[in-house]
């Protein structure tokens, strides 16, 4: 005679299965993933990033931005790096959100060096992640132990870029919701925006705060400086007209960004909102007061970002050329 089934036992078994499945999926990323398949991989990437930084310091900033733009859209899967091809992929780089991004050609330089050592082994997604890690360290930021084992996407997500990556004119509520969608909490979001301590903002992205009248929340003296940097309300997008995010330490990831926005010297409207919104202001104040705390939270935030929904296991592929899908 068949034994009666216990509904609660079935539910418990299902929950156990789901928990194990989730755990196994998350564990496919690991520290030193290439220790056996390509033991020199991380050293080669670090060496290439350092050499490029010594020649072109702004490359380190590009690697940090690449990580953000890649991971915010679906997954940390190097979909950002794909080039447009006729009747095929449309590059995410064609989106207006990618305006001002550069140095992609040097990703190919890093990839070529790794391929020479270990062909078809190290993913472009891991190169994006590790180059950001090494770039952060070169820019005076924290040293971060990062997991690897990501695989590369077989498609571009250009239609999802606009809905995934916050715009400089977005409200702080929308920005927080975009990060929350990928499980990045408020404190980590405030820390990630500290990446604005390096690099620059193009005039096309800040003139709305200057013309026809100056944004009342902007420090008047700083506004005059910005108007000298951006003397027209209609700058040519192709012209390299910009202002540094941080005038004091423009190429160091430090807490000066938070000190600046507390003085109403942030370049973007989201910077001003970050300093004044009650959900974020306490973290801004704390980071402005304590650079070590900022670095700790920045490290945590970068890890959360870099481990967003990775493609791993037997999914995706390991691209031979980061710009194009592998030929079938």
Protein language model regions, located:
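Catalytic cores of secreted/periplasmic or lumenal enzymes
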Residues: 2-328
